[in-house]
């Protein structure tokens, strides 16, 4: 197979973890659907292989509309899903021409009978992860007032005791849908001064379109809990008029929270390093 020159990857992945010495073109996208369509555009213009790299999570299902286009346009796209969270043993007939399971990128480069577009599952060692928690809650507890609204999900753990504001724990465990929209919807009732959402990175990516809703207002404050400093999230929110910042989890203070609250503008803060 020809040397890989183009990679599009979702921003929740660290490309260096998989291809530390990659010297070609690499483009970060916020979500799987966008990543694949960016890849189809590059492939169509250059007539060269494009690798689209994303997690094998529920969100990876949205990549298949773009892969269907790649199939019918006969574009040289390789969809690489990291991990085996979903069962892709049975693929749709009009999405890919070949399907492989490998344990390293070197194996992908050495595949000689690869018929494109293709789907490759990249096996990685399973990580045992508990429910995420964040030091941001400790600072919020001392910063919110009775006139605030705080929303989070079952994917984040914290002790609700001691919060002066209204606290809502929404959704179900492992459900990633609608977190941002829930806070937006609550804000439209205009019963509170400030509407705060603390969400995981995956929850943000599943509902990121909510930031562009016409009803977004200055009472909204979102904290996005990430493993790493995902600058793409801040760039996206800033393009939609949000005040943005990023703070390491072990450095966040009550003063940081107060600064965000005091600007009285719609805001998004990435808290990374949990």
Language-model features and meaning:
Residues 1-23, 130-183, 187:
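Active-site diphosphate/adenylate-binding microenvironment
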Residues 8, 50-55, 118, 267-270:
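Periplasmic-binding protein-like
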Residues 11-13, 84, 122-128, 154-156, ...:
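Glycine-rich beta-alpha junction loops
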Residues 17-21, 38-41, 65-66, 139-140, ...:
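A short acidic, amphipathic alpha-helical/loop segment
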Residues 19, 34-52:
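Conserved catalytic cysteine-centered active-site region
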Residues 26-29, 45-48, 67-70, 76-96, ...:
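Thiamine diphosphate
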Residues 55-64:
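Glycine-rich anion/phosphate-binding loops
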Residues 113-131:
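Terminal amphipathic helices with adjacent charged low-complexity linkers/tails
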